[in-house]
Amino acid sequence: MGTKNIGKGLTFEDILLVPNYSEVLPREVSLETKLTKNVSLKIPLISSAMDTVTEHLMAVGMARLGGIGIIHKNMDMESQVNEVLKVKNWISNLEKNESTPDQNLDKESTDGKDTKSNNNIDAYSNENLDNKGRLRVGAAIGVNEIERAKLLVEAGVDVIVLDSAHGHSLNIIRTLKEIKSKMNIDVIVGNVVTEEATKELIENGADGIKVGIGPGSICTTRIVAGVGVPQITAIEKCSSVASKFGIPIIADGGIRYSGDIGKALAVGASSVMIGSILAGTEESPGEKELIGDTVYKYYRGMGSVGAMKSGSGDRYFQEKRPENKMVPEGIEGRVKYKGEMEGVVYQLVGGLRSCMGYLGSASIEELWKKSSYVEITTSGLRESHVHDVEIVKEVMNYSK
């Protein structure tokens, strides 16, 4: 028998970070990081390339807050290019301050260029801009979509995400090599969970590695296929290789609380990709639904039947199958409506700042060097959550 046990896998709920002596206040920490070899972020947050999470409104919001959004690919090439152009044509605070300081700009202008009123300049003083002063944006493509990549690059996209459920595969590597040989663009490749995959993708030109097979709330890959590595262990394994090449790791999936972001970064990620937490915000493209007195937004995995029918089948090697022959690796569901994304991101960033303060880390690079963790038991997890009391007033950043 060739099967071997390569060890225990840990995920976010299995560990707690250990506090250090600190002279660092949360408000003083720097959250700047690398998305790829050549593209930076002001905050280490990325909205996922899902058709119920990121189109131009989400991407604009993320970039204005210092992160980045990845436009999903479940649309034709022209539509995806237009989504990228809407982000690039959005008037940033920098441009407003220089050219239209007193102008009240509508969210959607009549000439097709998207703009937004400058109601809260403090919230958007950390914008993630390219070298022309435009908001940064990424876009996802699948295997062999060279023409799509070319059109996106011509539209000014800042990064291409070559997206697959199994990034350590022949056609992904072939597509990566072709893009890198023909275009001057940074490419993130995923998803992977092993040292071998990380090394091979980097050696073939990857500028960023996306880590995670099956940790997402709407993903069933680990149950349907029996494949995956718990996310903390996957990040550790992949970052141990990527760090030697100076290539950033993006932790994709499994984030439920702000504390999980700190854990992902502490074990080696440079940024995290988020889906479900942002799916309930106003800026996501998911439809609203009122059930009783509660508003929800539609949210589905890219491995669900609905998403695969709309164009993500190639991500799961099922692009040519009829619906009744598809084997889904995700579900369709709903999440509670949360209002505008600014408040959600504020809580995530605030929790991360607190984490770094506890660990005495003024930067993400310091966090890598100073962090240590303990494995906890189910009793330790139970103790970590609210217990022996009934919550009578909900808070934005916690639910059990």
UniProtKB/Swiss-Prot annotation:
Matches recorded under InterPro entries? Aldolase_TIM (IPR013785), IMP_DH (IPR005990), IMP_DH/GMP_Rdtase_CS (IPR015875), IMP_DH_GMPRt (IPR001093)
**What's the protein name?**
Inosine-5'-monophosphate dehydrogenase
Q: What does it catalyze?
A: IMP + NAD(+) + H2O = XMP + NADH + H(+)
Q: Identify the catalytic residues.
A: C219, R315
Binding-site residues for K(+), renumbered to this chain = G214, G216, C219, E383, S384, H385
User: Which Gene Ontology terms cover its molecular function?
Assistant: IMP dehydrogenase activity; metal ion binding
Q: Which residues bind IMP?
A: S217, D252, G253, G254, G275, S276, Y299, R300, G301, M302, G303, E329
Q: What is its EC number?
A: 1.1.1.205
Name any cofactors this protein relies on: K(+)
Query: PROSITE patterns from the entry?
Result: IMP_DH_GMP_RED
Oligomeric state and interaction partners are given as:
Homotetramer.
What does the entry report regarding how activity is regulated? Mycophenolic acid (MPA) is a non-competitive inhibitor that prevents formation of the closed enzyme conformation by binding to the same site as the amobile flap. In contrast, mizoribine monophosphate (MZP) is a competitive inhibitor that induces the closed conformation. MPA is a potent inhibitor of mammalian IMPDHs but a poor inhibitor of the bacterial enzymes. MZP is a more potent inhibitor of bacterial IMPDH. Resistant to mycophenolic acid (MPA) inhibition.
The entry assigns this protein to a family as follows: Belongs to the IMPDH/GMPR family.
Q: Does the keyword Oxidoreductase apply?
A: yes
